[in-house]
Amino acid sequence: MRKGSKMNRTVKATVGLVAIAAMSLTGLAACGGSSADDGKGKVYFLNFKPETADQWVALAKKYTDKTGVQVKVQTAASGTYEQTLKSELAKSDAPTIFQVNGPVGYQNWKGYTADLKDTGIYNELNNKDIALKDGDKVVGIPYVMETYGIIYNKDLLKKYTELPGAKIKDVKEIDSFDKLKEVADDMQAKKDQLGIKGAFTSAGFDSSSDWRFKAHLANIPLSYEFKEDGVTTQPETIKGTYLPNFKNIFDLYLKDSTTAPSQLSSKTGNDANSEFALGEAAFYQNGTWAWADLQKAGMKPDQVGMLPIYIGAKGEENQGLATGSENYLCINAKASEADQKASKDFLNWVVTSDEGIKALSEDMGFTTPFKTFDKVKSDNPLVEEAVEDSKSGKQQVAGNFTMMPSEEWQNQLGQAMLAYAQGTGSWDDVRKAFVDNWKTEYDNAHANQ
């Protein structure tokens, strides 16, 4: 994610330490395979979400200061988590806590996952059914439920509704793709009057941004197909039933944009964030985790709202936001008993302490699935929108990232989408990457099982 950051961020397979944004705490030197001298064990967390790297480092330092337990945090560079995890797990000083994206990612690391059934963090879940399980074994704990959609600038939408001939009088009237397109097209035509550069922020395909499209946007047509066909476990093949709808929304992003398609390959996540925060665009596809960056760029809580991503599917007026988890925490079963216990204690502290609750809910902007967060009112307006949406009675779109056969499937899809956007590829190439390559990547992932 991501979140990510998320809810999954990928491309450029630069492997090794060069690809790691390494963040160690309290100036600790590498400590080999041994535990801390006082026998407390130590913690090494390999974080998946680059957008929360600094926050995890700060939180871990607080824990070290409080308990004396060494905590190291490293964050894999965008798009390199699987390669980085493989490299790090092969070392004597391997991560004691790592992440998988769900059932598919778990298959790669099932030999490394400890049973978390008796841990504090598992017992703090509001609903234990959402834990990642393998038979009776609890192998992963989701620590963030991420919600995403089309973030909109309330001030710009209000300004638009006051223009002569505006297609809506209130943003609540946008409840379908047709209405979204009508409004976006009109805003694009009146961009000079509105003082914007485009209705939508740039659809950047730099690795800091492409996950918004090859994973998050692709999830919408997948979700409709899976719902229609009653799919609940990873399918060997898909049909691409809603690919025309996928094209609808992607074309709209390209046409009513701040940026020419020829420039998208180098456009970053920061570019889109900046365009939106500066009022250069009214719409920005992203999620609850984006608030920290928007706030840092000067936006106020009452300036933002979030719409569902409409694609022209039947009944979408009852569609809510997209929500789910692709962030499951696992503990390395091959770490020493002392390090495993230290890691379990650290995670329990993260979800039960005032410091941890504040870090996850405020500093990282997460919506979390733990009992200890029930009374937390988030300062993140996008989280509040997500909470309201969950109570609205609308059908939320499931996050099917964990069903996607591989990171490579996303990468190939992203490359085909960029080529289509730039005019060097066709939509049929996107179809092949979406449908045909699903089977290829599924077969590759299951070849040794």
Predicted regions located by residue number:
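Conserved N-terminal structural module of periplasmic/extracytoplasmic solute-binding proteins
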Residues: 2-4, 8-105, 118-121, 316, ...
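Short helix-initiation/N-cap motifs at beta->coil->alpha
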Residues: 75-84, 175-179, 263-278
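Hinge/lid segment of periplasmic solute-binding proteins
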Residues: 101-158, 305-307
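Short, solvent-exposed loop/beta-turn-alpha elements that line the ligand-binding surface or hinge
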Residues: 117-130, 169-173, 204-207, 222-248, ...
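Extracytoplasmic/periplasmic solute-binding protein
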Residues: 137-143, 148, 178-234
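Glycine-centered hinge/linker elements that transmit conformational signals in sensory
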Residues: 182-185, 228-266
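Extracytoplasmic/periplasmic substrate-recognition and gating elements
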Residues: 258, 297-364
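Conserved C-terminal helix/tail region of periplasmic/extracytoplasmic solute-binding proteins
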Residues: 368-369, 375-376, 391-449
